[in-house]
């Protein structure tokens, strides 16, 4: 009797759900199995956009080059081929290259279009259901997912592709501010900001850059101040790609954070002494991050989050040269000022640009609240997301690793650290497919 494939239900309508769908189909094809039935439950249609691409404005760029953005792990040039097929040209008329940083709206169209093609193929086994999942429970060896309208769907495996929660509330330094925007990615969040408003942007990361450039384009002459404790802006990608360094050489012993930091510092000094840029050193470590992070004990992970994470993030998650050119022009013109010492009374509106809260935080999702309450999932030791193994299989309160409940994306930040950029999302999607469809 031919082997069948399990049914899979993916909760979430962003790009990660499409990566999981594609990975499952590729895995089944590689094993000579029938394509699994995949159902994606999404609050917003079309599937594939999510907040990252569905709320992006036309000038918002990807933070990774086009060569890294393919949906398929087997066809790394897929996104570039798509751009060539559609005849895409940048604002300066140039064609896309491997090192191009493409607008996020364009990438969202690529992802959503790929999923729509699967929906349009009656033989694909892929379906989409619009709605909000509010609970996942075990029912007779399967998983039952209940939607807000009381619809119940069942599958053998559930993958949580929940995306990013809204930012946590920020009270300081907003005391005295006329009004606040708690979530800049909520629909219409920036519409109430006027050209004459004195705007405080809380945070100096990638979200701040998106919001600052958006407000400056909407309201030429607007005056903005960005604030954070250390005023660290994201670093900038090199003009041309440089091959990555080899990363860390294993000593055969369990890594500890002090030793890893010493070795990383040594490599940076070596690069500097040779007149080479630092970016390839960090890029060489990137493929090793999941294994290194999982090998660290809870104490070292917490130390990293407390003392290293912010500087790691601004160097790891870099902006394109064109984005830096626009941002630096705002700073040079006085449109945007950076200040660590601000008073709320000086501003008409404050925008929370601190980034998403933890997926494991209570109150933002009835689905997450229910899973935590039932012990089906637990927060990771650092409180950044859910505890899980390298394949995204979630750990329950009893300590066991689930064979039916997985996660991908921001939910795995505390388990794997680097989880939200496309290369890591694609990698975890492949691992999930390998677990769901073993050889």
Predicted regions mapped to residue ranges:
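Redox-cofactor-proximal catalytic regions of oxidoreductases
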Residues: 43-90
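Flavin (primarily FAD) cofactor-binding/catalytic cores of flavoenzymes
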Residues: 1-45, 51-54, 93-258, 262-439
């Amino acid at each position: 009797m031919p082997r069948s494939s399990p049914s899979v239900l993916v909760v979430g309508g962003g790009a990660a759900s499409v990566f999981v769908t594609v990975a499952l189909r590729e895995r089944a094809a590689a094993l000579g199995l029938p394509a699994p039935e995949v159902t994606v439950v999404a609050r917003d249609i079309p599937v594939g956009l999510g907040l990252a691409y569905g709320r992006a404005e036309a000038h918002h760029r990807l933070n990774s080059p086009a060569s890294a953005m393919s949906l398929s792990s087997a066809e790394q040039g897929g996104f570039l081929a798509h751009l060539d097929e559609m005849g895409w040209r940048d604002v300066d008329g140039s064609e896309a290259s491997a090192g191009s940083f493409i607008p996020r709206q364009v990438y969202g169209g690529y992802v959503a279009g790929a999923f729509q093609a699967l929906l349009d193929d009656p033989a694909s086994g892929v379906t989409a259901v619009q709605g909000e999942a509010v609970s996942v429970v075990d029912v007779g060896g399967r998983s039952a997912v209940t939607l807000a309208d009381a619809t119940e769907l069942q599958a053998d495996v559930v993958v949580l592709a929940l995306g990013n929660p809204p930012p946590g509330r920020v009270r300081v330094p907003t005391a005295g501010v006329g009004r606040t925007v708690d979530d800049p990615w909520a629909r219409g969040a920036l519409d109430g900001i006027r050209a004459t408003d004195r705007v405080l942007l809380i945070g100096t990361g990638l979200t701040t850059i998106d919001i600052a450039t958006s407000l400056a384009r909407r309201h030429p002459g607007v005056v903005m101040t960005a604030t954070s404790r250390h005023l660290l802006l994201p670093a900038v990608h090199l003009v041309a790609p440089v091959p990555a360094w080899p990363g860390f050489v294993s000593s055969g012993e369990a890594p500890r954070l002090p030793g890893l930091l010493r070795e990383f510092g040594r490599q940076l000094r070596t690069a500097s002494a040779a007149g080479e840029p630092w970016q390839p050193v960090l890029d060489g470590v990137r493929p090793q991050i999941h294994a290194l992070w999982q090998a660290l004990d809870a104490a070292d992970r917490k130390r990293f989050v407390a003392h290293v994470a912010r500087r790691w993030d601004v160097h790891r998650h870099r902006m394109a040269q064109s984005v830096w050119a626009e941002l630096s022009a705002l700073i040079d013109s006085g449109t945007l000022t950076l200040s660590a010492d601000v008073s709320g009374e000086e501003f008409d509106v404050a925008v929370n640009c601190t980034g998403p809260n933890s997926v494991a935080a209570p109150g933002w999702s009835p689905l997450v609240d229910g899973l935590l309450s039932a012990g089906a999932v637990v927060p990771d030791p650092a409180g950044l997301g859910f505890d899980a193994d390298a394949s995204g299989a979630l750990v329950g309160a009893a300590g066991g690793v689930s064979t039916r409940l997985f996660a991908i994306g921001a939910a795995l930040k505390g388990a794997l650290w680097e989880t939200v950029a496309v290369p890591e999302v694609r990698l975890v999607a492949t691992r999930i497919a390998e677990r769901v469809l073993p050889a």
